[in-house]
Design a protein with these regions (language model features):
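Auxiliary, metal-adjacent structural segments of Zn-dependent hydrolase domains
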Residues: 2-96, 159, 163-166
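N-terminal, positively charged nucleic-acid-binding surface of large information/translation enzymes
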Residues: 89-91, 98-101, 108, 138
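Post-HExxH zinc-binding segment in Zn-dependent metallohydrolases
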Residues: 132, 140-177
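Short acidic/His/Gly/Ser-rich catalytic and metal-binding motifs that mark active-site loops
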Residues: 86-90, 129, 133-138
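Short amphipathic alpha-helical segments
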Residues: 25-29, 112-116, 120, 148
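Active-site recognition of the HExxH zinc-binding catalytic motif
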Residues: 115-135
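Pan-zinc metallopeptidase signature
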Residues: 178-231
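Short pre-active-site segment immediately N-terminal to the catalytic Zn-binding motif
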Residues: 99-119
């Protein structure tokens, strides 16, 4: 069974965190970063339970979050192993472990609080936006979700960067945006303007995100297909 820990927030309430695997080597420093991210985003009075799963076979920096749109008190987070180390170490892993089986050893001194904070803040922003503005992908056609999620990602990382918090850089996000949306019919005409608008936006809602996608798709365009809220 995953181990449950309670971390007190600034107001004295306890954030319960369950880890899987329970003996994850970086659990204690990672949990401090996670609790800080919850407080930084003003979610300490909203989220009470977090279930955190580590994909130890994935050396990349993929992460995603799931929650019940009608109850924001609990959420599930999944993190690939690369979220806990620096980008430099991830690149080193890709060279030295590309043809090896198993996973690289992970020691406490390798933990990157900034890298993990970037992942935590980004994923928790998805829940925060649903809680405050009703932004969620579940009510949209499956074929639109990957594109809508990337528009949402741009908006999130733009806000985090303006606050000086750990986040994907503008250049990195722009490259992911291009890879995800380049096949939409009007990307070459409006893609750059849509990216700038999302990156600079402070307040958006589900209708605005949908409108940006429709602008990229054009009258009869289709967005690429996939799922979930991913970084």
């Amino acid at each position: 069974m995953p181990r449950q820990r309670a971390t007190a927030d600034g107001g004295g309430a306890a954030l319960r965190v369950r880890w899987n695997p329970p003996d994850f080597a970086l659990r204690e420093p990672a949990e401090r970063v996670l609790a800080d991210a919850v407080r930084e985003l003003g979610l300490a009075g909203v989220i009470h339970d977090l279930h955190v799963s580590i994909d130890a076979q994935n050396r990349d920096d993929h992460a995603y979050i799931e929650w019940n749109t009608h109850d924001h008190r609990a959420a599930r987070l999944w993190f690939a192993l690369g979220n806990f180390v620096t980008p430099k170490r991830r690149r080193m892993w890709s060279r030295t472990w590309a043809r090896r089986s198993g996973t690289p050893p992970l020691m406490a001194r390798q933990f990157s609080a900034r890298s993990f904070a970037e992942a935590c803040l980004h994923e928790l922003c998805h829940l925060k936006d649903d809680h405050e503005s009703g932004v969620d992908l579940s009510g949209h056609p499956e074929s639109d979700r990957e594109a809508l999620n990337e528009l949402w990602n741009v908006w999130i990382d733009g806000r985090l960067n303006r606050r000086g918090l750990p986040a994907m850089s503008r250049g990195e996000r722009r490259r992911v945006f291009a890879r995800t949306l380049v096949s939409t019919p009007r990307y070459s005409a409006v893609g750059e303007r849509v990216f700038r608008a999302l990156w600079r936006a402070d307040h958006l809602g589900p209708r605005e995100l949908r409108a940006y996608l429709e602008e990229l798709k054009g009258p009869r365009g289709d967005a690429p297909a996939r799922s979930r809220r991913r970084r």
